[in-house]
Amino acid sequence: MDVEIQDTPGKISISKRSILSGTVENIDYPHYCDLLRKMNMPFVKGLENRHNYGRFEKKCNPAFLKFHPYPPSVLPDYHLHDPYPPPYGPHYPLFPLRDDVTLGDSCSGFMSPGGDADLNPGIGRTIPTLVDFSDVKPQHRVPRPDTGFQTTIKRQKILSEELQQNRRWNSREVPDISIRARLGGWTSPLKVTPLQPHHEGRSLSHIFTFDEEATCTDEGEPLVQTNKKCNAKDSFYKSSTQKAYEDVPWDKMLPPKLVPEETTLEKTADPISQCFTLKRYKGVPAITQMVGELWDRFQTRSFLAPVKPINFVSSSSRSKYIPLYTGHVQSTNADDVDNPLGDIASLAKQRYSKPLYTNTSRAANIPGYTGKVHFTATHPANSNIPSTTPSPDSELHRVFQKEMAVDLFRHQAPLSRLVTTVRPYNPFNKKDKETIDY
């Protein structure tokens, strides 16, 4: 199968014609062109534009020495290179940048494949296992054979036998299990003779007789004194008691019996959570698992992730109006309402949820006051009335304001300081005028 690969730096493109022309040889690595287009796969660096591979080719680099344990023999005096790699043995270096091999698999809880390759149990480098010898790794576990058609026939036969039986409650019926247990041979092929029960001084076949005595006098009045024999006679199990038990609807009062399972072995054991859940295991692989090595090489993003740049921004955060405001927002361009980079200059007065200032410490401003207030005023009514008992803080602030007072005109020129005593007076003269009577 011919695959056309373009040499564009940073991208890989596979033609659809080569994919659909024939079957894929490797089933585990199918090429899903439509699925790969939906994924946000990072760019693959080619030979021209290397990505993090140049450091392996540097001389005297530990990663280079591990990748090439012995220098090529074509180099002159290759055995004199320093540092010389160690010889082959138990301390032979691993693959480049593979020193931190985890021994345990975080998914299954057993030994990871990297730990098996590092320890080499067959060569002699073994460690004591942390699990029982009966435990088997998931990749080495043999599935339980399914009996198939024979199990289906057996279940149908048992079901037909149960349907033919009378499932109503019968107190006189003796179960087959009880009869087989009495006769023996339930757990052994030989017939077991049950032992005779020993009774001390009494027998089950003993018949009790009661003398019929008169229960009433000759005049027809019942006897007052009770007889113990009558009480003992009434406590015996009689046919009337049996009939009373049969009239009780036990089938409606008692739950149905539980059918025992054929085996106690779990179908799919989970060594991590130790729970049994059939919905967790799916026989059909997901689409993301069928991508192959590209899925393991690059961690993809979720399909539901928002694609940047984001072209929508809430207009209420920029117009400074309350949320869900459906009124008119004035702007230079109407398209800037949905544009995150647009300029919205609202010319209308903004709405505030902050209430107006109220002061209930004064006599005239009691709650429910309906005095006259100007329609443009934001202060409460009669707020200019001074308080009856000024606090010391107000006197202190008043002194500070008097000391920090600054001239309103701030004229410091010589002509501004002149004082004219005739009309028109100097407007900057702030001396008090005195009237003299002749």
Swiss-Prot record:
Transmembrane segments: none annotated. Induction: Down-regulated expression in testicular samples of azoospermic men. Disulfide bonds: none annotated. It holds the Pfam family SPATA48. GO terms for biological process: cell differentiation; spermatogenesis. Testis-specific. Keywords: Differentiation, Spermatogenesis. Essential for normal spermatogenesis. This is Protein SPMIP7. It comes from Homo sapiens (Human). The gene is SPMIP7.
